Amino acid sequence: MDATTNFFISYFLPLISFLGLLNLLYTLYSRSRMDRLRFISSSVVSIFTILFGTMPYARYNRLLGESFCNLMVFVLPVSFFLVSLLLWLLRNKYVSELK
């Protein structure tokens, strides 16, 4: 493993996972001030961020199978995009019903 990959896996990805965890904790803390759709979307973004940060780390340290981690590194961004699109469409429908 070269130095750039080692730095990326050792420092940057855990930072991304930590920020996702902080976002999830803040979302749970301020749940009473959020509407339901904003709470769901923020929770989903936090969970995807945590998973995206931990999958390559688990792969290079052989904590999970390599083929599973390769699949997750592909599936997570695609599913994140699809879930974000769905939440955006629901939000637009929700906002248009309020008007």
Curated annotation (Swiss-Prot):
Membrane-spanning segments: 7-29, 39-61, 68-90
Localisation: Cell membrane
Key words of the record: Cell membrane, Membrane, Transmembrane, Transmembrane helix
GO CC annotation, single: plasma membrane
Entry keyword annotation includes Transmembrane helix: yes
Domain of life: Archaea
Mode of membrane association: Multi-pass membrane protein
Name of the featured protein: Uncharacterized protein AF_2130
Organism: Archaeoglobus fulgidus (strain ATCC 49558 / DSM 4304 / JCM 9628 / NBRC 100126 / VC-16)
Phylogenetic classification of the source organism: Archaea, Methanobacteriati, Methanobacteriota, Archaeoglobi, Archaeoglobales
